[in-house]
Structures are given as C-alpha cells and as structure tokens.
Amino acid sequence: MKKALYGLVVLLLFSVVQFNVSDTFADKIGYKKIFTNNCQKCHGKDGKGTKRGKGLGVPNFTDSEWQDATTDKQMITAITNGKKKMPKQGHKLSPEEIKAVVKYIRFFAPK
C-alpha cells in the first residue's frame, strides 16, 4: 500500500512539474509575439538593441545590472506612457499585454 501511495505521489508531482514547464513555455511564446510585433524594431530580437535602438539609447535587456535596477512598475510606466524617444504604447496594448511584455523582457536576464 505504501509503495502504491508513494508511486501516486511521485506521479502527481511529475504532472505538476510538467504542467508548470509547459505553462511557462506557452507564456513565453505569447509574450514573444507581442514583443516581436511592438518592441523588436528598436530593442532587437536578442534584447541588446538594434543599431537604430542603440542610437536612440535603448537599454540592454541582457545587462544584469539594468535588470536588477529596473522594476516591473518602471517598465510598465515606460511602455504605457513612453520614455525619452520611445513612443507610448498604452493606447495600442492592453494592460495585460504590457505586463506580458515586461515578463518577456525578464527572460533576457542572465541566468
């Protein structure tokens, strides 16, 4: 009986872990689409900034110091209202989409 219960617990834990991994991957894909369509032109596919973006002074999203120093709230405000030469996106993206972009930007953080 103990072995059966142990096996069931292990199976249940594996299912939960598998679900979370799949969920994270699916979220990342959705976030990537929003980023690609709205941000990539200046911020680059790799988050380091395109030539155009660097000329405009965009941050390097792969910089751990920038990631540590920048809060989600600061990013939400910048995306919503614009910042320096970056146009505001609050009229174009929903609050949920803006939060998705912030989550995607966090994927660029060095591991």
Sequence positions of predicted segments:
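Positively charged n-region of N-terminal signal peptides that target proteins for export
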Residues: 1-4
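Bacterial N-terminal signal peptides
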Residues: 8-18
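Electrostatic cytochrome c docking/interface patches
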Residues: 16-34, 50
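Stable alpha-helical elements in mature extracytoplasmic
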Residues: 31-35, 71, 75, 82, ...
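Periplasmic/extracellular electron-transfer cofactor-ligation site
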Residues: 32-57, 83-85, 107-111
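Axial heme c-ligation environment in periplasmic c-type cytochrome domains
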Residues: 54-59, 77-109
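Short microdomains enriched in Cys/His and/or Lys/Arg
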Residues: 62-73
